[in-house]
Amino acid sequence: MNKGIERSVSVVLGAQWGDEGKGKLVDLLSESSTVVCRCQGGNNAGHTVVAGGKEYFFHLLPSGIINPNVLAIIGNGVVVNLEALFQEINEAVNKGLLDVASRLRISDRCHLVFPLHQEIDRMEEELRGLNLLGTTKKGIGPAYSSKVTRNGLRVCDLIGDWDQFTAKYKELVNYVKRRYPALEINVEESLEQLKTYREMLSGMVCDSVLLINKLTESKQTKILVEGAQSCMLDIDFGTYPHVTSSNCSIGGVCTGLGLSPSRVGSVYGVIKAYTTRVGSGPFPTELLDGIGEYIQKKGNEWGVTTKRMRRIGWLDTVVIRYAHIINDFNALALTKIDVLDGLKEVKIARAYVDPETGNELSSFPADPFILSRVVVIYETLPGWKASTQNCRVYDELPPAAKTFIETVEKLLNIPIRWIGTGASRDSIIIRSV
């Protein structure tokens, strides 16, 4: 046993169905970090950070790269669309971020997302007819499928022997064309583009497993891992089949970076003051009335990646307790409380009941049919008319808003350390809990 091990890694994870505002907490914590990492997912993720009057949208890059002093690492668990990556780098540079390419390291073990994966994603969704999963059509699922069927190509293949890469790429094309005869792929054109990306990757690719584990040995190094998507979209623990294709919970951090669990010091969960989800799937607290419409408009609830309108529901502590069982959060960040300003009353889901037996469910149901039928038991609290927007101190909040926060804490038995009160990076309350 290594008794001198440093628990220098902090992790930020979503505890709902994504879009919780993880970027805001990552932006804050990255100020005291030396390294920021992505561990899973691809450019189906979407993190938004507002800083210096500019709005930054991140899909593949760790959003903590906004801090000019950090090293950013894309870990082995991420699937990388190179066209999207370089486009994102250019957009970040054009908005004034410094030395983005020179501060970025990409794992040589990352699997690659090709246009053929995106086409397969689109075709598969069309084949589902009315039973849509709500995929982002970014090719993420098919890329992970290639990884699991062991015919995927990795960054190390692309930067290695070109003839070998060409042969492997053609094998992959032949494999998918046998299954999708309608798929049109210009192999030579694709290879020419990939050769360009191969040159552009120069200096960025590394053995990220070795790099990260060496970095954890230093007491001066503070590593921040930002999860993409969220626990309820986890391929194993989410509301399957309406999930993403990777592990978005704490296990995905370790496997997606080659990091021992013993290196992880703190795990922080991020929740909204209400709940949202994009695409299909059961949603027990969903609001299909004027209140839902009010929250949707006021919260500007549109997907960063998909541009689709997000579905709206009340805060669901059953979901968050389940996420806590899996991830063991040290503390929570509660975002967008300002969106609830002006409501006559606010509700918090505290339990699910089986509609046939009338019994409270003892665990979060794996079966989506059961989840779609549950009766939700709510705590109903008075709303508040006074604005919480841009509050910086807890005691500045209206009494009813504080009651809401403290009720959530009591129901979850997890401290809420951060409270988001607006879009700006400075619109946050930090509590000593």
UniProtKB/Swiss-Prot annotation:
Catalysed reaction, written as an equation: IMP + L-aspartate + GTP = N(6)-(1,2-dicarboxyethyl)-AMP + GDP + phosphate + 2 H(+)
Cofactor note as given: Binds 1 Mg(2+) ion per subunit.
One GO MF term: GTP binding
Pfam families xrefs: Adenylsucc_synt
Annotated binding of substrate, by residue: V304, T305, T306, K307, R308, M309, R310
The keyword Nucleotide-binding appears for this protein: yes
Gene Ontology cellular-component annotations: cytoplasm
GO biological processes: 'de novo' AMP biosynthetic process; IMP metabolic process
Cofactors demanded by this protein: Mg(2+)
Reported function: Plays an important role in the de novo pathway and in the salvage pathway of purine nucleotide biosynthesis. Catalyzes the first committed step in the biosynthesis of AMP from IMP.
Name used for this protein in its record: Adenylosuccinate synthetase
Organism: Schistosoma japonicum
